[in-house]
A protein has these predicted regions:
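Conserved glycine-rich cofactor-binding loop
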Residues: 14-15
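Conserved glycine-rich Rossmann-like NAD(P)H-binding loop of the short-chain dehydrogenase/reductase
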Residues: 30-45
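C-terminal helical subdomain
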Residues: 176, 192-230
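Residue(s) in the substrate-gating loop at a strand-loop-helix junction
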Residues: 136
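Conserved mid-core segment of classical short-chain dehydrogenase/reductases
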Residues: 66, 88-102, 145-148
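Active-site helix of classical SDR
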Residues: 116, 152
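The beta1-alpha1 cofactor-binding region of Rossmann-like NAD(H)/NADP(H)-dependent oxidoreductases
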Residues: 40, 57-67
Length: 261
């Protein structure tokens, strides 16, 4: 995909990867970047910086996403690329409350579903469009220390796969961004060793990898290339992979498994 002269929406644009993506898209000549965030002040700040448009939205609410799509297309024009980037990480295992699971599910999974539900038919009607969904390497592998995050990111990738093969013949293109650790507020509470096994990338580096992935129209965008090796190892010997993850879990002392007396 050529970013030049495209109308692009980025959720979670107030900080981290979303902010970096918005800046990169503007520098690449996007016609207009709509910066959306749950924090209206942050989304306006980045929009003002890049001469974009700010629209407040909480991606865990379908009504907000309906409004984001409708307002963007009514005021700016047809959306060429929608980046479903906003996500949350809650460090918990069996102790996670139902509301923790629900919030992770709505933000990390349903947000992608709601965007597709209300935008894909519009895109098909005009000949096609592009969706970029930020998932995580945790959706391909898993997440030590956070059951809601690992599970929800697996579901997000599963939905992205379904979209890609169901609507690919109707002009819908799709990429899934799956980084490991990125220097954002999201990893502030993570164990340092767990976060830095393959290096903590800056949001700018991730955004650059994303631009290349969009240019190549790759389904999986992996800023940490090691993830592909890990995924192949997992597929080739699941039991060995589980053993390796248990070893990492012990090393990081983040096990959520209840211990017997």
């Amino acid at each position: 995909m050529d970013i030049k002269n495209k109308i692009i929406v980025v959720t979670g644009a107030g900080a981290g990867i979303g902010r970096a993506l918005a800046i990169c898209f503007a520098k690449q000549g996007a016609k207009r970047v709509i910066c959306s965030d749950i924090d209206a002040i942050k989304s306006k700040e980045i929009a003002d910086l890049i001469d974009g448009v700010s629209i407040e939205a909480d991606v865990s609410k379908e009504a907000d996403l309906i409004n984001l799509i409708a307002q963007s297309e009514a005021e700016i024009g047809s959306i060429d690329l929608f980046c479903s980037n906003a996500g949350i990480l809650h460090q918990a295992g069996l102790d996670a409350l139902d509301q923790d699971w629900q919030r992770a599910w709505e933000t990390n999974v349903m947000s992608h579903i709601w965007v597709a539900r209300h935008l894909v038919p519009r895109m098909i009607a005009r000949g096609g469009g592009y969706l970029l969904q930020t998932a995580s390497a945790a959706g391909l592998l898993n997440q030590i220390g956070s059951a809601p995050y690992g599970v929800s990111k697996h579901a997000a990738i599963g939905f992205a796969e379904w979209l890609a093969f169901t609507y690919g013949d109707q002009g819908i293109k799709l990429s899934v961004l799956c980084p490991q650790a990125v220097q954002t507020d999201m990893i502030a509470g993570m164990d340092g060793h767990a976060a830095s096994l393959d290096g903590i990338l800056s949001p700018h580096v991730v955004a650059q990898a994303c631009l290349q992935g969009l240019k190549d129209e790759r389904f999986l965008i992996l800023p940490h290339p090691e993830v592909l090796t890990y995924l192949r190892n997992k597929a080739s010997d699941y039991d060995r992979w589980i053993g390796g993850m248990r070893k990492l879990n012990r090393a990081n002392d983040t096990s959520n498994t209840p211990k017997g007396k």
